[in-house]
């Protein structure tokens, strides 16, 4: 399964091109900007929600709403975004992460709208962002945060995407996999720094990835460990290393009740 990321990015470019033909950027931007102060759509403060949980002594859990993945196939047959989001909210999640990629993760924009609409938690649009158009899409769908993957973006475009998100009131989670990507991530303004324990080019997973990068992390960054958190021992290992923010999907999606599994994992 070599270089999955390149395949995904090629499809993303085609998706954006097709979306622009259906709706022009000025129209989409106007809608996104108009929602900033509208009841129910105003940004909910993704970073703030994480920090509040951690300040209260809890883990800051970004709980994922994900039907499938390229490496594991369908994770949850009984996939009801509203029920999943409600369960997460009632069992201690700080935020949601909702997959909107259709072709590789069987996600959808409607899943983001439905999950966010069913609970008070802020939501991340989990997708492969390659164009400003997608940032405006994210806000028009209600997203409170976007994901920027260093491996997928050149530094100039990444900075532009971040600036656009911040102008719209959204937070930004920047994601790295290795030390070679850290410098680019640290040039951004966002304090939210995700470390993906899964290599997006091979889909191999190692929790050592987060631990190995910790010594290089500035103190003002909030480190989010992503992927491979499957049991309480994984959580303990990270929290013992002073990592208190987690993005977890598969372990929750495979459980009978995702929120109950969240509470068990982070008890």
UniProtKB/Swiss-Prot annotation:
Its EC number is 4.1.1.48. The keyword Transferase does not apply. Keywords: Amino-acid biosynthesis, Aromatic amino acid biosynthesis, Decarboxylase, Lyase, Tryptophan biosynthesis. InterPro entries: Aldolase_TIM, Indole-3-glycerol_P_synth, Indole-3-glycerol_P_synth_dom, Indole-3-GlycerolPSynthase_CS, RibuloseP-bd_barrel. One of its GO terms (molecular function) is indole-3-glycerol-phosphate synthase activity. The keyword Lyase applies. It comes from the Bacteria. One of its GO terms (biological process) is L-tryptophan biosynthetic process. Pathway: Amino-acid biosynthesis; L-tryptophan biosynthesis; L-tryptophan from chorismate: step 4/5. It is an enzyme of class 4 (lyase). It catalyses: 1-(2-carboxyphenylamino)-1-deoxy-D-ribulose 5-phosphate + H(+) = (1S,2R)-1-C-(indol-3-yl)glycerol 3-phosphate + CO2 + H2O. HAMAP family: IGPS_B. Belongs to the TrpC family. This is Indole-3-glycerol phosphate synthase. It comes from Cupriavidus pinatubonensis (strain JMP 134 / LMG 1197) (Cupriavidus necator (strain JMP 134)).
């Amino acid at each position: 399964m070599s270089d999955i990321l390149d395949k995904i990015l090629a499809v993303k470019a085609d998706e954006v091109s097709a979306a622009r033909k259906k709706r022009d950027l000025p129209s989409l931007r106007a809608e996104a900007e108009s929602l900033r102060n509208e009841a129910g759509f105003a940004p909910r403060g993704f970073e703030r929600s994480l920090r509040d949980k951690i300040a209260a002594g809890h883990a800051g859990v970004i709980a994922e709403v994900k039907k499938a993945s390229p490496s594991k196939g369908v994770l949850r047959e009984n996939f009801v975004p509203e029920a999943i989001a409600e369960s997460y909210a009632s069992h201690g999640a700080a935020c949601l992460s909702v997959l909107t990629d259709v072709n590789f993760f069987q996600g959808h924009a409607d899943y983001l709208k439905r999950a966010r609409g069913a609970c008070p938690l802020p939501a991340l649009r989990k997708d492969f962002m390659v164009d400003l158009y997608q940032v405006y899409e994210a806000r028009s769908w209600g997203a409170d945060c976007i994901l920027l993957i260093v491996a997928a973006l050149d530094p100039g475009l990444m900075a532009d995407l971040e600036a656009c998100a911040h102008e719209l009131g959204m937070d930004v989670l920047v994601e790295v996999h290795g030390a070679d990507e850290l410098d680019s991530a640290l040039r951004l303004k966002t304090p939210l720094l995700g470390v993906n324990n899964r290599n997006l080019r091979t889909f191999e997973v190692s929790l050592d990835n987060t631990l190995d990068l910790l010594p290089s992390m500035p103190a003002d960054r909030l480190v989010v460990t992503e992927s491979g958190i499957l049991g309480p021992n994984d959580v303990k290992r990270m929290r013992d290393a002073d990592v208190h923010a987690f993005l977890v999907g598969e372990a929750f999606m495979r459980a009978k009740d995702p929120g109950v599994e969240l509470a068990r994992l982070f008890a």
